[in-house]
Amino acid sequence: MAKVLISTEISKPYAHWKNVFDSLESERAKVAIKNIYVGHEAGNEKKCHILFEVPNPEVLKKFMFDPKNAARMNEAGLIRESSKITVCSD
C-alpha cells in the first residue's frame, strides 16, 4: 500500500472543512483509501495536511477528480491550486 501526503490550503473554517472531509469517509473506504493523519499546521488552521494509505496513487486521483467528490471538496473550501501531492516510499 502506498502512502500519499497532501498539503493544501482552505478558504473556510477548519471545522467546516473537517466536517465535510469526515462525511466522505465511507466513500473513501469503498475504494480502500485509509486516513493515517488529518490535521492542520500549529497556529494556521488554513494549511492542512492529510496522509492517506492507498492501494495505488491512481485510486486516490480518481477519487479526488470524481465530479461528486470534487464538488464536495470545493464546497468545503479546498483551494485546489494550492494542493501539493507527494507519493511517499514505503
Where are these regions (language model features)?
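Short S/T/G/P-rich N-terminal loop/turn motif that feeds into the first structured element of a domain
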Residues: 1-70, 79-90
